[in-house]
A protein has these predicted regions:
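A membrane-interface helix-boundary motif in multi-pass transporters
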Residues: 38-54, 247-265
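Helix-loop-helix hairpin linking two adjacent transmembrane segments in secondary transporters
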Residues: 25-72
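Extracytoplasmic gate region of multi-pass secondary transporters
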Residues: 95-153
Length: 285
């Protein structure tokens, strides 16, 4: 909801606004695991959940009230004074988007990160045992993931505002592709930090591009229904990734072979996107 609102009402600084929006989540991914592990040493996990619930009940209504109290948007389409071009862009409905071949090619790129990253997170014990990294290496590697994700968030926001999401989209999964190469070739514990760090770079790019790209191509009038569709596909992709990784492990695939499968998918999606990159433009009325 937050990213959809920002996508709809911001145009000139949409990238920076989305970066700030995602900053909270990425920061929490860095801080909360360490905090929870510490709290588990002094209290039971049930007490931690009660504590979290109390904080949410107290602070969420208060912060929501004060943050939205003085918000004032004129219209959904007229988000900036200099907005004459925005009004001429065709506003695609969801049914029209589903008939556009570009949507499916973009989705192939957008959905690579969710299923590959989720599969890696869920089966981290399999990866760790295959690489003989020890029980804590991957947990420590999440710090590299979070730090690089946050850094990339801010950088991507400025890049999107300068170059547009459509031009940056083709580069989004390249760090993830290099991550699969690292996972295939290297076994040293340091490679865990490099792999998850590269995943974090793609995650930072994907968080911002995942909202702004649709708005640039299909307009903002129906961005809510379009985002609902893409979010549902993302959730399906994470479930698919978990199932696929599990299936491949069950039939005897090594983590190196899974890395090859993942890398082949990423490479294929980049090639497809390359052939249509010049067509990723909005239609003008």
């Amino acid at each position: 909801t937050a990213t959809t609102t920002i996508t709809r009402y911001f145009t000139k600084s949409r990238g920076k606004a989305l970066s700030i929006c995602w900053f909270g989540l990425s920061t929490a991914e860095f801080i909360l695991p360490v905090l929870i592990v510490y709290l588990l040493t002094i209290t039971a996990w049930q007490n931690i959940w009660i504590f979290i619930s109390i904080i949410i009940l107290i602070f969420l209504p208060l912060t929501s009230f004060f943050l939205i109290k003085k918000l004032d948007f004129d219209t959904r389409e007229q988000v900036d004074i200099d907005n004459s071009e925005i009004k001429e862009i065709k506003q695609w409905k969801r049914i029209e988007v589903l008939k556009d071949y570009r949507f499916y090619i973009i989705c192939m790129t957008m959905l690579a990160m969710p299923w590959i990253a989720t599969g890696s997170f869920v089966y981290q014990s399999f990866i760790s045992s295959s690489k003989e990294w020890g029980p804590y290496v991957i947990a420590q590697s999440f710090m590299a993931y979070s730090i690089l994700s946050v850094i990339t968030l801010f950088i991507s926001g400025f890049l999107i505002d300068k170059f547009s999401s459509r031009k940056l989209l083709i580069y989004m999964n390249i760090p993830l592709l290099f991550g699969t190469i690292v996972l295939y070739y290297f076994d040293a514990p340091l490679s865990s930090f490099v792999f998850f760090g590269l995943v974090g770079v793609t995650n930072g790019l994907a968080n911002v591009l995942g909202s702004s790209t649709w708005a640039e191509i299909y307009g903002v009038k129906y961005i809510g229904s379009i985002k609902a569709l893409t979010t549902a596909l993302m959730v399906f992709s994470t479930a698919f990734g978990t199932a696929l990784f599990g299936f491949l492990i069950d039939i005897g695939f090594s983590i190196e072979q899974i890395a090859v499968v993942s890398g082949a998918y990423i490479f294929g999606s980049i090639i497809l996107l390359y052939f249509v990159k010049n067509k990723l433009k909005p239609q003008y009325l």
